[in-house]
Amino acid sequence: MPFKSGFVNIIGKPNAGKSTLMNAIIGERLSIITPKAQTTRHRIVGILNGEGFQVVFSDTPGIIKDPAYRLQESMNRFIEGSFQDADVFLYLAEIGQKPRKEDIPEQLQDTTIPLILVISKIDTGNQAMLEEHVSGWKALLPQAEIIPVSATNRFNLDYLLNSILHHLPEAPAYFEEDALTDRNERFFVTEIIREKILLNYQKEIPYAVEVVVDEFKDEPQIAKISAIIFVARESQKGILIGHKGSALKKTSTEARTDIEKFLGKKVFLAIQVKVSKDWRDNEKQLRRFGYLS
């Protein structure tokens, strides 16, 4: 039986469930998940290997219609890149999202690349809502196969994977058989820390931070990690640290616990907070943080 391999790029609005879906299909927690929009900032690859196939999923940031910062413009460019190299598109629309043509990226409206429209989070809706959404999206994207799923309950995930495999081209594997992602451990450590910030802080703080791991010593029994949280303004630094350091201590403890699970060993985690004034609009800093090449 010929080997199948290809790139499956996941597109959708912020908070449509893209990261949850990729994590559920792959069976690993590669993308961080929070209730906040714009949780995913980078394009993250997750690799699923099976008998006779390799699927390379790409989780992208949510589409931002009117970017307010150069950071958000860079995030949109990651999405643009995903339109160029796909063998299959998954366009995610959660069941609460009314079918509207203006929400569909132009690149998908007339694409000749196989397109699967995934109606996500169907566990939060009902049968009448689902039928309404299926008919509405079918009218807007008649070329798309429509598959309703619940990643949380794993409903229809096997059916979705079989559909993806049907569309994949015959090709050799792009990555080693045991590969899970193209990202290194440092990247996932920064994402875990950022996830805790997104969960523990409100308003502007979660969107004004960037996390950098400046030291990573991976010893046999313990990983010694030093990280810096950059904020855009001095006032944000105080909020992030909290009274007598209480807020930062909580975030650090929660991050360390998850990093230990991720690495499978004890972790010593030291975190500093520094100000990088208006970094979201600073080209030099955006390059440093990996948002510009």
Regions found by a protein language model. Give the residues of each.
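Conserved G1/Walker A P-loop phosphate-binding module
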Residues: 1-77, 81-83
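Conserved C-terminal guanine-recognition region of P-loop GTPase G domains, centered on the G4
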Residues: 52, 76-144, 217-219
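Catalytic P-loop NTPase motifs of RecA-like helicase/translocase cores
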Residues: 40, 64-65, 98-99, 125-126, ...
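Conserved glycine(s) of the Walker
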Residues: 17, 156, 247
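P-loop NTP-binding site
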Residues: 185-293
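Canonical P-loop GTPase G-domain recognition
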Residues: 114, 123-181, 185
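Active-site glycine-centered loops adjacent to acidic/histidine catalytic or metal-binding residues
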Residues: 59, 120, 150
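Conserved, well-folded catalytic cores of nucleic-acid-processing
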Residues: 28, 47-51, 63, 82, ...
